[in-house]
A protein has these predicted regions:
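Domain-level signal for Mg2+-assisted phosphodiester chemistry and nucleotide/NA-binding surfaces
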Residues: 2-103, 144, 154
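Nuclease catalytic cores that cleave nucleic-acid phosphodiester bonds
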Residues: 68-168
Length: 168
């Protein structure tokens, strides 16, 4: 899986202070898009290595839906061991068979809260609804936003809003 972008390396020069970053991961979005595109899971360890290299993590949150099964609890434990705070919403199955577990508002609120303490926001999602958030963070806080997403499954509006798009 391609994870590295030929753009900015994120490496600091000796003596420069570490860039303070906030990492926000839309777990459902990245799970389904990597599964559909590559037939496998997103590599959270590799992502963490790349996104945090020579950077200071101010906050790292993974937003997920809780179905209450053991396999998911184990996955959530792994995310916590990597360094993420895991925020959960209950999985709601509607009478018509559709499901609900959307974190868009929660991710947006946290981005606006923590961006003021960061030099960079890193968002992992392909959801075009976040294009407005990315624009707002860049404008209101004057910080760059890196978006990690799966090519072909990441909204063009989100890619265009980002300071840097990193294909997963």
């Amino acid at each position: 899986m391609a994870l590295y972008h030929p753009g900015e390396s994120g490496l600091k020069k000796t003596g420069d202070p570490l860039k303070k970053i906030v990492l926000l991961v839309d777990v459902q979005n990245i799970y389904y898009t990597t599964r559909d595109a590559y037939g496998r899971h997103f590599d959270y360890n590799r992502f963490w290595e790349r996104a945090t290299a020579n950077r200071q993590v101010v906050k790292a949150i993974a937003y997920a839906v809780d179905r209450g099964d053991e396999k998911q609890r184990q996955f959530q434990t792994i995310l916590r061991a990597i360094g993420f705070e895991v925020k959960l919403k209950p999985f709601i199955k509607r009478a018509d068979g559709s499901a609900k577990g959307d974190w868009d508002v929660g991710i947006t609120l946290d981005a606006m809260e923590y961006a003021k303490h960061a030099d960079l926001l890193v968002l992992v999602s392909g959801d075009g609804d976040f294009a407005l958030l990315v624009d707002r963070v860049r404008h209101d806080f004057g910080i760059p936003v890196e978006v990690y997403g799966v090519p072909g499954f990441t909204a063009f509006a989100l890619i265009n809003a980002a300071t840097e798009y990193v294909p997963v």
